[in-house]
Amino acid sequence: MPQPSLSSLYSDHLRTLTARADEALQRGGFEHLVVPSGSTHYQLFDDRDYPYAVNPQFKAWVPLTRVPDSWLVYTPGKRPTVIFYQPFDYWHVVPDAPSGWWVDHCDIHIIRTPDQALALLPKHAERCAILGEPHSTLGAYVPNNPQPVLDYLEYQRAFKTPYELALLRIAQQLAVRGHRAAEAAFRAGQSEFGIHMAYCAAVGQDANDLPYGNIIALNEHGAVLHYTELGQQPPQPLRSFLIDAGASAYGYASDITRTYAADPDSDFQALIDAVDAAQLRMGQNVRAGVDYKQLHIDAHLALMGILKEFGILTVSPEAALATGVSAAFFPHGLGHLIGLQVHDVAGFAASDRGGRIERPPGHPYLRLTRVLEPGMVVTIEPGVYFIDMLLDEVKKNGHAASVDWQRVEAFKPYGGIRIEDEVVCTDGSAENLTRPVFAAA
């Protein structure tokens, strides 16, 4: 069956966005939605810009990520307007003229200076819901970020359109290409920096393009959850490799983690295999009506069961969870929403009118507490780590007998394990976006 084109998918996506915007504006009492793309600004006491990052509310409408000082304007009943800043500039590369599958669906105006946008924005700024950062202020058009508008739009962003799913799949393909190159570099004995460069070259993206800083962790560095130091020399001996790295596709992110052992016959490889199999089962439980908080708790029990089997825990999974010992080995959340942002918004939202669903007690780093619904895309990223600071807390809290410390010492040189896929909640079985791409790569 032929796949729909991005142009047709975008047309449907735009209808969804305009319907959402109509409702959001009605709730907020505004007549126009105005979204600046964001602006560049200097670093403190310097004449160099901070790296530009596009406003996520802007790239939801159009697949443009490097167009500072541009604007999106939507008025109910009218086509979206894109005010596209294309300066006369011989110091920097100027954005190409708008092109692609989206241009026929919007009214596009080219401006040469930022203040030319004033003549194209709605006449009455006070009637506009302006979603952006303070630096985007232009004349009377000051971002006001009205809460009823944001609450509705951000809540609805959890439900991905077919167009968004198509772009998320492209982001998966790019990232997996990088992951394969990174694994090969690890097997060849490269340093963290060398592995990182191999990844970027394979994906075709650098630090300004990637959705987040690559985590390239060899040996004990795998115990640092967000390790981004990129050592220049490979450690000796080389034992393990944890990579958490994604890619960007037209403003949408992927977020994938894999862990490798240098010795395929080691106990660490066996532990990786056990966590990998458990992670796959966790992903299959992403179903409509399931509370993500419960998935997180179930992940704790599953991982502690593995540690018990490997002789690392001496108590039951339930006891490890109840006493907080499990959090020493699995100290982060099971995952989060993903889309325009790696940690996509409204993970705690109680409804499209606001409110908050709190995390379970004792689990302060879980980033998603909602009940799953069709269209949501979530990460499933269980992990097991050997972190001195957290293991010391186990001893201080009187639970040293819950752990076989000799087994812990044997695994500490490997740092930790994390496996992460992206999974779509559907009306039926879960759809894993990541595994099929690895299988085909």
Swiss-Prot record:
Lineage: Bacteria, Pseudomonadati, Pseudomonadota, Gammaproteobacteria, Lysobacterales
Protein name, UniProt field: Xaa-Pro dipeptidase
Cofactor(s) for this UniProt protein: Mn(2+)
Gene3D superfamilies (UniProt xref): Creatinase/methionine aminopeptidase superfamily, Creatinase/prolidase N-terminal domain
Organism the protein comes from: Xanthomonas axonopodis pv. citri (strain 306)
UniProt: Mn(2+) 1 binding residues: D255, H336, E381, E420
GO biological process: proteolysis
Classification via Pfam families: PepQ_N, Peptidase_M24
GO molecular function, one term: aminopeptidase activity
Function comment: Splits dipeptides with a prolyl residue in the C-terminal position.
